[in-house]
Every structure is written in structure tokens, then in C-alpha cells.
């Protein structure tokens, strides 16, 4: 009887130890891997432009799968495009997001708009971008708008001059953004002062944006 009571108390102590330590419950308290993934995803803007169902003819019939065109950006000048394919829609979107993050590139912006007029081409898609004054907004179509918003462009005039296929429009928009150059780069290449290269309004808008960023940083540290 004493041995049985001792064994029972030992089991109770071991069980209590697990309860005190939290055991598997600690993963739930920390949020698990899902919590970390949610926090990481919240730092980026994700836009699913289009989802298509495709099929492959095999000996036994047809095999269906889904493709997803995804735009990912931080809203501060970084953006990327990804194309995912899987048997299920969520898996295709996840693959597209992963590829888009691998394709990140920096977009030069001044005061929330593009630095100069530019035209990008990809396959049959042609997209033209023009700078716009503050308050104009993003004047663009659906596929082009998704890229510009994820890149952090707030004021721009965009026009699609070629194919209206979403994939072509997205890649043409990316090609246009990759052609953008900062005024310092153009001035250095031409050997001219920056005032002779960039319009006065653009330089003034950049100074105002930098002043706002500095004031916001000071308020955040205060």
C-alpha cells in the first residue's frame, strides 16, 4: 500500500511538473510559428492580381491546377512580382508571394511620385508612367494600380497602351519602374548640377518629404 501511494504521489508530481512548466502549452503562449509568420506578413502589402485555372492533358485525362499572379511590396519603395502554380489556390498564392519576395527591387521616388516620365514594355504590354502633383492619387488600371500601390507610389498618372492582359500589364509596369533613375544619377552622368537636371518643383517636393520624415522620426523617438 505504501509503495502504491508513493508511486501515485510520484505520478502526481510528474504531472504537476508538466503543468507548471507549461509543456506543449508554451507553444500556444508564444504564438507558435503561425504567430511569427503573421507578424512577418503584416509588414508587407500583398495583392493577388489574377488567378487562373490551367489543365494538363495526360494519358489518364486532364490534370487541373491553379496559377496566381501576386504583387508584394513594403509601401516604401520596395516591390516584387511573383507567379505561383499549384493544385490548390492557397498554395499557388503562397508560392507567388515567396517568388515575389525573391524578386524585390528598389523604386526611386520623390515626394510619393515617380522621378520622371517613363514607358515600359513587356511582351505585348506597354505602360506609360508620368509624375503627378500631391493629391492626384494613383490614376491607373487594376493590374498596374496593384504594382504602384505596393511600391509606395501615391501620386502618378499611368496609361496602358498595349495588351490588356493582366500578366503583360504587370510586367510592363515593372519594366517601367526599373527604368526610373534618381536625379543625382542623371546629373552625375551628364556632369551637370542637379538643379539643371530636375525641375524645381520636384526638388522642393523632395525637401518637404525629407523634412516630414525627419519630424516623424523625432516624434517617434520622443
UniProtKB/Swiss-Prot annotation:
Molecular function (Gene Ontology), one example: rRNA binding
Any Pfam family hit: Ribosomal_S5_C
InterPro entries listed in its UniProt record: Ribosomal_Su5_D2-typ_SF (IPR020568), Ribosomal_uS5 (IPR000851), Ribosomal_uS5_bac-type (IPR005712), Ribosomal_uS5_C (IPR005324), Ribosomal_uS5_N (IPR013810), Ribosomal_uS5_N_CS (IPR018192), Ribsml_uS5_D2-typ_fold_subgr (IPR014721)
Gene Ontology CC terms, in alphabetical order: small ribosomal subunit
GO BP of this protein: translation
Keywords of this entry: Ribonucleoprotein, Ribosomal protein, RNA-binding, rRNA-binding
Region Disordered, residue ranges: 1-41
Biased composition (Basic and acidic residues): 15-41
HAMAP family reported in the protein's UniProt record: Ribosomal_uS5_B
Domain notes: The N-terminal domain interacts with the head of the 30S subunit; the C-terminal domain interacts with the body and contacts protein S4. The interaction surface between S4 and S5 is involved in control of translational fidelity.
Protein name in UniProt: Small ribosomal subunit protein uS5
Organism (species): Mycolicibacterium gilvum (strain PYR-GCK)
